[in-house]
């Protein structure tokens, strides 16, 4: 599906601070030129981590080379709360399952930048243009992301073109995201019940929404979605949650926090 969407240039989707450097590399992909641009940004103390990471990723894609000294940009950055190996493993798994866009959007900025550095430093890992676009594009414009994310704005296999308004739209996005991340649990995960409870809550919610759309329920979507949020909040308060470690813990925690904030706002 993603291949049917137009792939925009890197300079159209990157942050404003990285745009000039990325335009230079796009217009003149000569290795010497790109290498000079990368090293300037790598050593530029005034450049923030996100800007440098975006320049690094475009350099990696154009040159097909591991950026020299790429780990230097993490100097002084506290990344101890993340396990880079687990982070990259989950990303590779999301590529295989077609959920990489949702996975990246569920990470906070630091985790995403840390993952980018480790992806770019892996000589065995190739990057296509769509992957780089998904890493560097901003969250404010959903048209920059893959078709998988666009279709996640409504429940899968919905029997009609349902329009969700206000907070319902955000709740649906969170529902789809948390379900897809929960399906990516590691095979050796000890928190099996935790993940199963999440999937069960999401599946039951989809069934109820489908039934409502078909006129089989007397109550409305508000009741269904609020009930789902309450159930997710309850699941994350149980001891089983403590067994979810590594990137699964970080990602699901971020999404569950968004669920809790949305619930409080209603």
From Swiss-Prot:
Main location: virion
Protein location: Virion
Pfam families: Mx_ML (PF17536)
Lineage: superkingdom: Viruses
KW Transcription (keyword) present: no
Claim: Nucleus is one of the keywords in the record: no
Keyword vocabulary terms for this entry: Viral matrix protein, Virion
UniProt GO MF annotations: structural constituent of virion
Transmembrane segments: none
Gene Ontology CC annotations of this record: virion component
Stored InterPro entries: Mx/ML_C
Function in brief: plays a role in virion budding and release by presumably binding the ribonucleocapsid and the host membrane.
UniProt name for this protein: Matrix protein
Source organism per UniProt: Thogoto virus (isolate SiAr 126)
